[in-house]
């Protein structure tokens, strides 16, 4: 027994020594330019010192002699991108939603999520707020934990698990009343006690944040129900993201104390001013609508997408004018959308943001929105070494972010430039 304990202790000490040695490894990244997302300017040349998982220093003076180097050449390095609203478990067409829930196991959907997560990481998204797993139980918790354990590649994840919607007010619709146990895309609630139980259950099972559907074409959850969700989430130091498109739905979410509004398409000036006063974030999700317009195969679909984009463009002009804080989120729910999330950054520019503002919405400001500004969102000492590289100057051509050439996450290179 004593020999066994000695062996275990010896192995543990050796293991600690190996980890300590790895943590002391220093790498110096050289590139033509660094985008300082705080100052909004390029620094040339770029020198970033990485020690273990973290950024040790920035600038030539910080580079120690004899360190391992990565020479990236004529590229611009910048912080890893952040998507503030995705559905990684989503490989769903709306007209096949019920069929998907019936035919795909949660294990299979977790594997789909793993594939989508890897695709996003290689596209330069090193952090993701995944806001609703569309009926896959707690598979997103397993995905997050597997990434954190190093079992699979993927971004740093915050997950909202099942999301919460009013009874009968989320997909799939049109299910026979004879099938009360038919799987749903969100956890259905009715009444404040039901809401409280759902929030507590989701947090107990690993939710990093709570997602609520404040409306669906019209307000669904009441202010009282939303307030209970916010109360329970905030007690557990979780933020609340509210899906809301209507003025009434947005105002209900604001009255309840939600931390962010997802979509917000019909918000008027007064509502946006209230958001600004309360410091509530807006994630307008405009990029996927642009993509759907481009892919529309009928006059009816093109008209619908065109109308929605016009609404969104008007809302965005007001939001920018009154100073609402904006985070970038692509709302990817279809397989083809995962990894194409940088389209959202370009779409924000199409909707009136400057290129710097759009990039900040996917880096510096996104990190603040999700509560991780102490660890990601900028290339500066102390933050995780989550760094990407693109050709050219993204301040002049934001589409460069759709062609990421190099990705390092937590000091580990996951994508290298192809010669």
Question: For each of these PLM feature ranges, what is it?
Answer:
Residues 75-151, 224, 248, 252-256:
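Metal-associated gating/positioning segment near the N- to mid-region
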Residues 92-95, 140, 220, 250-256, ...:
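Histidine/acidic-residue-rich catalytic or RNA/ligand-binding cores of hydrolases
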Residues 100-101, 235-237, 308-394:
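His/Asp/Glu-enriched, well-ordered alpha-helical/loop segment
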Residues 34, 39-78, 99-100:
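Histidine-rich, glycine-flanked metal-binding segment
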């Amino acid at each position: 027994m004593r020999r066994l304990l000695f062996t275990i202790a010896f192995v543990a000490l050796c293991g600690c020594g190996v980890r300590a040695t790895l943590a002391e490894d220093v790498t110096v990244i050289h590139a033509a330019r660094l985008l300082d997302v705080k100052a909004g300017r390029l620094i040339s040349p770029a020198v970033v010192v990485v020690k273990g998982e973290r950024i040790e220093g920035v600038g030539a003076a910080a580079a120690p002699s004899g360190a391992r180097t990565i020479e990236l050449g004529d590229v611009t390095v910048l912080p890893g991108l952040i998507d503030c609203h995705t559905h990684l478990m989503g490989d769903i067409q709306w007209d096949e939603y019920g069929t998907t829930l019936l035919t795909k196991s949660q294990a299979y959907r977790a594997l789909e999520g793993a594939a989508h997560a890897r695709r996003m990481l290689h596209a330069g998204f090193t952090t993701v707020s995944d806001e609703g797993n569309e009926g896959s139980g707690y598979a997103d918790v397993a995905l997050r934990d597997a990434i954190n354990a190093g079992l699979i590649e993927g971004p740093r994840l915050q997950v909202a698990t099942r999301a919460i919607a009013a009874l009968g007010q989320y997909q799939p619709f049109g299910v026979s009343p004879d099938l009360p146990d038919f799987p749903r895309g969100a956890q259905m609630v009715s009444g404040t006690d039901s809401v409280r139980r759902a929030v507590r259950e989701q947090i107990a099972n690993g939710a990093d944040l709570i997602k609520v559907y404040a409306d669906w074409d019209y307000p669904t959850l009441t202010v009282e129900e939303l307030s209970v969700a916010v109360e329970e989430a905030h007690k557990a130091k979780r933020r609340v993201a509210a899906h809301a498109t209507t003025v009434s739905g947005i105002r209900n979410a604001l009255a309840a104390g939600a931390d962010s509004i997802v979509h917000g398409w019909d918000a008027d000036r007064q509502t946006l001013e209230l958001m600004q006063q309360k410091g509530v974030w807006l994630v307008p999700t405009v990029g996927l609508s642009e993509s759907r317009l481009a892919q529309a195969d009928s006059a009816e679909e093109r008209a619908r997408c065109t109308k929605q984009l016009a609404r969104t463009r008007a809302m965005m002009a007001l939001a920018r004018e009154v100073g609402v804080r904006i985070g970038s989120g692509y709302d990817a729910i279809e397989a083809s959308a995962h990894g194409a999330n940088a389209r959202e950054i370009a779409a924000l520019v199409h909707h009136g943001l400057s290129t710097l503002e759009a990039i900040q919405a996917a880096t510096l400001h996104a990190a603040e929105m999700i509560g991780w500004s102490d660890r990601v969102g900028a290339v500066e000492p102390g933050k995780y070494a989550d760094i990407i590289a693109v050709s050219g100057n993204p301040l002049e051509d934001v589409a460069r972010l759709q062609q990421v050439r190099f990705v390092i996450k937590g000091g580990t290179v996951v994508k290298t430039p192809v010669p």
